[in-house]
Every structure is written in structure tokens, then in C-alpha cells.
């Protein structure tokens, strides 16, 4: 997707405020890392098509690269999130889907 819709922006805001990368026992929320909109753009089609599930969400997280050290190292967002955060993301998406679709 090249442009964000109000629906994706609303989902991105929820993701950005609630989902964080754990960096040396410090929470870097996805909004602060500027990863909330790209993630929302990847998972929103799953919600639209009623295909939300762990495998699809993990595939979206794995597809999103996080640059570390000025781009010297790249890891997937799936690897950067704790299992707790992945579960929280799934719950957030399920709740969003039940309210909006």
C-alpha cells in the first residue's frame, strides 16, 4: 500500500501505543520506532479478508525489517518482539477486528 487510510492509521495508532520492542530492558514502542504504520499496512489485509491468525501475523512481522546500528544489522520485527508482545499484538488485532468488521 502506498497511502494509509484512516482505518489503517487508527490501527497503527493502537499498535504504536501498545506494542514495544524490548531493548536492554527498555521498551521502545513501535510508534517511536516508526514501525507502527508499516506493520498496520501489512496486517490490515488479514483483518479485511477475515484471515487473522498467528501464522499470518508472524509472517507479517518476519517480513518487516528493523535496522539496528545505523543499518549495520537488520533483524525481523518478529525477532525483535518478545513472545508476550506477539501475543499482545494478536489480542489487539482480534479486538480491533471484532469492533470494526
Swiss-Prot record:
Q: Does the keyword Thylakoid apply?
A: yes
Keywords, A to Z, come to: Membrane, Thylakoid
Membrane disposition: Peripheral membrane protein
| Alphabetized Pfam families for the sequence | DUF3181 (PF11378)
Q: Where in the cell is it found?
A: Cellular thylakoid membrane
Give the domain of life: Bacteria
Gene Ontology CC: one annotated term: plasma membrane-derived thylakoid membrane
Write down what this protein is called: Thylakoid-associated protein slr0729
What is the organism field in this record? Synechocystis sp. (strain ATCC 27184 / PCC 6803 / Kazusa)
